[in-house]
Curated annotation (Swiss-Prot):
<keyword id="KW-0830">Ubiquinone</keyword>
<keyword id="KW-1003">Cell membrane</keyword>
<dbReference type="Pfam" id="PF00329">
    <property type="entry name" value="Complex1_30kDa"/>
</dbReference>
<keyword id="KW-0472">Membrane</keyword>
<keyword id="KW-1278">Translocase</keyword>
<keyword id="KW-0520">NAD</keyword>
<keyword id="KW-0813">Transport</keyword>
<dbReference type="InterPro" id="IPR001268">
    <property type="entry name" value="NADH_UbQ_OxRdtase_30kDa_su"/>
</dbReference>
<comment type="similarity">
    <text>Belongs to the complex I 30 kDa subunit family.</text>
</comment>
<comment type="function">
    <text>NDH-1 shuttles electrons from NADH, via FMN and iron-sulfur (Fe-S) centers, to quinones in the respiratory chain. The immediate electron acceptor for the enzyme in this species is believed to be ubiquinone. Couples the redox reaction to proton translocation (for every two electrons transferred, four hydrogen ions are translocated across the cytoplasmic membrane), and thus conserves the redox energy in a proton gradient.</text>
</comment>
<dbReference type="InterPro" id="IPR037232">
    <property type="entry name" value="NADH_quin_OxRdtase_su_C/D-like"/>
</dbReference>
<keyword id="KW-0874">Quinone</keyword>
<dbReference type="GO" id="GO:0048038">
    <property type="term" value="F:quinone binding"/>
</dbReference>
<dbReference type="InterPro" id="IPR020396">
    <property type="entry name" value="NADH_UbQ_OxRdtase_CS"/>
</dbReference>
<dbReference type="InterPro" id="IPR010218">
    <property type="entry name" value="NADH_DH_suC"/>
</dbReference>
<keyword id="KW-0997">Cell inner membrane</keyword>
<comment type="subunit">
    <text>NDH-1 is composed of 14 different subunits. Subunits NuoB, C, D, E, F, and G constitute the peripheral sector of the complex.</text>
</comment>
Length: 200
């Protein structure tokens, strides 16, 4: 299988040399990295080329690397049922530069792109309906970014008296938790189950 993926990787890199910035095979999977502005051209070619025939877009997902100048990777997972291959196509972008939509190539990309926008704030140029998909209408921020606080910015709940949804500052009540902050190196006064060494 890896020999077939190697041949496929070379074929893609040679045919799309202006767009491909690199490719690799790891854990039996081919990953092709491309320039952001060439995504629609490359995916159209991957779909239509007789040696590829990647007719199914399985998923689009985002990855956040805050330390990079182009902090986001957009990852396209493709399937060729004809060739029995799966590949991953990646591109990098930042918070400002829009990624061209691939809805003309794969109509199923519509909701995948909306999810990436909603979770990461990745903007897809020429998307027909780029609005939030999974979060609330007035949601602030992008929850899958690494710099988003784990608790969020506000707490949302239904107020029975007002008969509406209300937004309040986050309040973490943890009275039920009993934290034992003693370091195990300072010597515990009790023996943990299964710790036979502590008895001797």
């Amino acid at each position: 299988m890896s020999e077939a993926l190697k041949v496929l990787g070379e074929h893609i890199a040679n045919a799309q040399d202006a767009a491909v910035t690199g490719w690799s095979i790891a854990n039996g999977e081919l990953t092709v990295e491309i320039h952001r502005d060439r995504i629609e051209t490359v995916l159209t070619w991957l779909r239509d080329d007789p040696a590829c025939r990647f007719t199914t877009l399985i998923d689009i997902c985002g990855v956040d690397y805050p330390q990079r100048a182009e902090r986001f990777e957009v990852v396209y997972h493709l399937l060729s049922m004809h060739q029995n291959h799966r590949i991953r196509v990646k591109l990098s972008t930042d918070e400002e530069a829009p990624v061209p939509t691939v809805i003309p190539v794969y109509p199923v990309a519509d909701w995948f792109e909306r999810e990436a926008f909603d979770m990461y704030g990745i903007v897809f140029a020429d998307h027909p309906d780029l609005r939030r998909l999974l979060t609330d209408y007035g949601f602030e921020g992008y929850p899958l970014r690494k710099d988003f606080p784990l608790t969020g910015y506000v707490e949302v709940r239904w107020d029975e008296e007002e008969k509406r949804v209300v937004y309040e500052p986050v309040e973490l009540v943890q009275e039920y938790r009993d934290f034992d902050f003693m370091s195990p190196w300072e010597g515990a006064k009790y023996i943990l189950p299964g710790d036979e060494k502590a008895e001797g």
